[in-house]
């Protein structure tokens, strides 16, 4: 009777592996998500930048680790002394963790400490190399000049030495009192 009872129990408790896999499979789902967040990024206990976002998703998959900001960001960048040196806004952003590379899309605006304003629809920020670049139309407003590059630009991240591709013109802006 013990053998019969054990056999009945063995066959009555059957696990469907497809059901188990479906429960454990979270591919495509964020590991962490949050709304109306402020994220602080530091290095050696010094604040490097702060990101404010309405929606944050963190993905930690085997081959890809990235943070996604599907509703955009406002980021503030800081010097070692704590002074703010610039800001970045965009309607969409994604940060690849291992590469330390930001992809910013849709109405990207960068303003540096000197007040230079860069506008483009797509920009990459390589934090390892400390450069920003784009292959799309870009516009830099600096004081009384506007520089437009039809094929993008490349610059240090502080926008002190931008190089534009296929410049369409430098326009002097007249400031009237």
What is each residue range found by the language model?
Residues 1-177:
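Mature-chain termini and adjacent capping regions
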């Amino acid at each position: 009777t013990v053998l019969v009872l054990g056999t009945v129990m063995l066959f009555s408790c059957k696990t469907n592996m497809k059901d188990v896999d479906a429960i454990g499979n979270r591919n495509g789902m964020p590991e962490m998500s949050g709304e109306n967040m402020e994220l602080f990024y530091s290095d050696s206990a010094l604040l490097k930048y702060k990101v404010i976002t309405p929606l944050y998703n963190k993905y930690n998959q085997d081959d890809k680790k990235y943070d996604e900001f599907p509703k955009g960001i406002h980021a503030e960048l800081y010097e070692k002394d704590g002074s703010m040196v610039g800001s970045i806004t965009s309607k969409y952003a994604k940060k690849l963790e291992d590469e330390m590379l930001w992809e910013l899309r849709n109405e990207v605006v960068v303003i540096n400490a000197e007040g230079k304003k860069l506008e483009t629809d797509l920009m990459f920020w390589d934090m390892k190399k400390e450069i920003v670049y784009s292959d799309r139309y870009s516009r830099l407003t600096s004081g009384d000049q506007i520089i437009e590059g039809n094929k993008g630009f490349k610059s240090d991240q502080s926008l002190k030495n931008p190089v534009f591709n296929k410049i369409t013109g430098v326009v002097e802006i007249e400031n009237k009192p």
